[in-house]
Amino acid sequence: MSIRIELAESMEVLSLRVVGPYYEKIPQGFDEILSWAREHHLSIDKSLAFYWDDPSKVEADELRADVAITCKEMPSTLPEDVGIRREVIPGGLYAVTHTIVENGDFAKAWDDFYKAINAQGYCPAGDICYESYLCDGSNGKWDIEIWQSVEAAN
């Protein structure tokens, strides 16, 4: 797997927290946030999923993720009752890869990505890691970019 190291700018997103098995809760979260965005006539630029827990260390029903979108024009206010928040994702140094995920095997893509980061002389830094979806996966294949904040390994 090839990666690139990129100095990214901060990014404003609208996000919704989901808790539970990633394979189950992330699609449900996207259904909810995308439905909300359509109801509010928002023009979506990107769909992202931020992962806050390592599935090898946290029970599946306690896994936390944020599904998020970026919009051409962000709404000035957000309703308090739907759980959608405005957040700024910090800029900085990130490792990035572009890959195709088949048969729902996102774990393999992440494993390969982390091996490539280490092979390039970097290690994860901070907690920011996410997927940026370049298609809707309706054909069973997910065209994605994976992003991880990094620093040079010592």
From Swiss-Prot:
* Localization of this protein: Cytoplasm
Q: Which GO terms describe its cellular component?
A: cytoplasm
- Kindly indicate whether the keyword Repeat belongs to this entry: no
| GO molecular function list | DNA topoisomerase type II (double strand cut, ATP-hydrolyzing) inhibitor activity
Name the Pfam families for this protein. GyrI-like
* S-S pairs: none
The protein's job, in short, is: Inhibits the supercoiling activity of DNA gyrase. Acts by inhibiting DNA gyrase at an early step, prior to (or at the step of) binding of DNA by the gyrase. It protects cells against toxins that target DNA gyrase, by inhibiting activity of these toxins and reducing the formation of lethal double-strand breaks in the cell.
Protein's recorded name: DNA gyrase inhibitor
Organism, scientific name: Pectobacterium carotovorum subsp. carotovorum (strain PC1)
Taxonomy, top ranks, is: Bacteria, Pseudomonadati, Pseudomonadota, Gammaproteobacteria, Enterobacterales
